[in-house]
From Swiss-Prot:
Pathway where this protein functions: Metabolic intermediate biosynthesis; acetyl-CoA biosynthesis; acetyl-CoA from acetate: step 1/2
Catalytic activity from the UniProt record: acetate + ATP = acetyl phosphate + ADP
Enzyme active site: D153
GO molecular function annotations of the record: acetate kinase activity; ATP binding; magnesium ion binding
Pfam families per record: Acetate_kinase
InterPro entries linked: Ac/propionate_kinase (IPR004372), Aliphatic_acid_kin_short-chain (IPR000890), Aliphatic_acid_kinase_CS (IPR023865), ATPase_NBD (IPR043129)
EC number(s) given by UniProt: 2.7.2.1
Protein name per the record: Acetate kinase
Taxonomic source organism: Buchnera aphidicola subsp. Acyrthosiphon pisum (strain APS)
Lineage: Bacteria, Pseudomonadati, Pseudomonadota, Gammaproteobacteria, Enterobacterales
Keyword hit for Disulfide bond: no
Cofactor(s) required for function per UniProt: Mg(2+); Mn(2+)
Annotated residues for binding of Mg(2+): N13, E390
Amino acid sequence: MDKKLNNLILVLNCGSSSIKFAILNPDNKEKYLSGSVECLFLLETYITWQCLGTKHKKKIGANVNHKDALNFIIEQVFSQQKDIFKNLIGVGHRVVHGGTKIKKSTLIDSNIIKCIQDASSFAPLHNPANLIGIKMIIEKYPSLSRKNIAVFDTSFYCNMPETSFLYAIPYNFYKKYGIRRYGAHGISHNYVAHRASLMLNKQFKSLNIITCHLGNGSSISAICNGICVDTSMGLTPLEGLVMGTRSGDLDPSIIFFMNNHLNLSIDKIETILNKKSGLLGLSGISSDFRYFEKKYYCKKHAKRSVDIFCHRLSKYIAAYTSVLENRLDAVIFTGGIGENVPLIRELVFSRLSLLGFKINSNLNLSTIGGKSGLITEDNSTPVFVITTDEELAIAQETNSIINRK
């Protein structure tokens, strides 16, 4: 047995329409198994995975749900890796929303499962999927039942000030029902913020940065002296930036108009705002940013959609400079779009030249495909592209908690 196959963590991320998994060593950061199931509930659900350098891809079927996909992963992938699995010391589960009670990563027990269930109203597309993964792993691997750790996206925001997390509605709605800003993507924001502190050679506790996680779901966070003081996602992951299928910010009266004048039910409106808006709604064609990158200069609907995306993002960046105590060390771009679409970085920072941003075109164009680095001129406020690794962050947090027990 390879000695490196010790101290392994299984990381499971059950999303709304996908499942990602990985087995890695949190100390040497080496991944031994990784993969994903994409396009759940659609006509063609497929799985791709890589184990010890060998790549695989299979079609699972049509209209596959989370349980079906997890059973396939367990029976067709995990069962073939007995040497790896017998060296697992724990399982880390990404959970989007911890609700009002959970402030940090924690060992999963019946009480934590109930808290995640109770918080599902705040993350209706994500928490139920997270719970399916948790329950199946505990059921299928009873020897690890006391070594399942929940790592929450909302934990990163637990120290935000009231000025950021309260909405201007009757205060009792917060005290009685927990209606407030919670944020999301906290695992990613926290990871790239710590990477940025190393790249800037600054103590994390003195770091003032703005982090932009841009993907199918997008969010932005302001970090002042190492503490997140504001973020764009709110009670749910619907608020904030323009996203793939989510609207982001809008006038709440739009909901009343849709309901009262268009006779749309609340459930129908919720579906529209979560699954049929954003880039998909603006273009009427796609939510995939690769499409918009190709068509930006030749299709009006693509240019319109991208320009609105960039307009919203640049406004947030400018606004967040106001909560950083008069010092901005850097802006960080991460996530699938943030890491791989130079066009977006160019368009956003061309709108922010007043704040001292000067993009280096060559660095911007070459920093893609997993590369991290500075993309600005020497006399500019720094902008970094940093590749996120939520799986590694979850594995390291899981390992830390297990070793504290």
